[in-house]
Amino acid sequence: LPSDGVEKVVAPTVDSESVVEETTMNLVANSLIENLVPSKFEGFVAWGNYSILKKIVNSNMFYPVFVTGLSGNGKTLMIEQLHAEAKKELIRVNITIETDEDDLLGGFRLVNGETKFVPGPVIEAMERGITLLLDECDLGSNKLMCLQPVLEGNGVFLKKVNKWIKPKEGFNVFATANTKGKGSEDGRFIGTNILNEAFLERFAITIEQPYPTAAIEKKIVLGSMEKYGSVDEKFADNLVTWAEVIRKTFYDGGVDEVISTRRLDHIAKAFAIFGNKMTAIELCVARFDDDTKESFLDLYTKIDAGVLENDSDEDTVEIVSTESGETRSEE
């Protein structure tokens, strides 16, 4: 101690070896750590192209696949359940017209008060050796062209941090779309775009996903009913027949709308909630214009002739049509 009794304050020394240099690695934020294996979907029925895609997933090879088909026929669900069964991680990215390189490959973000480069979902999938799912791919713009080297199975150079990313073994790309990347001529899928031919050419195969057969669809509907706790096999039969007739009419150009497998699942859930067949159907087809809605309802009453007399529910459900202004009750 000094003679005056006051302790000297000594500045701490800094070990030169502990100083962190500003390197590329220091600019990059940590990757995701959670498990990305999809959850198993109760009541899922494997059908159609499931076995083909299963072989691709199990091969662990890089083999980009483009899956196309009408809305609500299980394209995305099938891919997710394949990975759930294989216990393989999957990153699903929903594509929109606004999706760009920053969204896909990554960009600078504020992380704990510091500016860090946060890898995008494409980079995460490449570095982890897992599957990247580009959902609703045909809604994207030409900004998707940043994925060209990725779809070739090669690495990609991150220009923002001067870093080369090489895909780990097991990395693959799946894409789903309502069109084949040629746009929607009939306007059913407004917002879809014509994708670059060079982009499409990089997908090894294209899988065309139809709606399931009547036998398969009945299993799907019964599975939904069981999941929601309200099983009625006769109702399931009638719903599948009804949807099949509407689809045939749609393909022949007789109607502009179609009943999807997803909509049948919605009806099964509505039936479990309201306990009334016609209420469930009417609520789930109310999104169509009045003429289409009434024709679909009328068709169902012809398929299930006694539905209006036999339907019963403890409560009366009032359904108001915003187009016609009419109010009707379902007993």
For every predicted segment, state its role.
Residues 1-330:
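C-terminal regulatory/interaction module of P-loop NTP-utilizing enzymes
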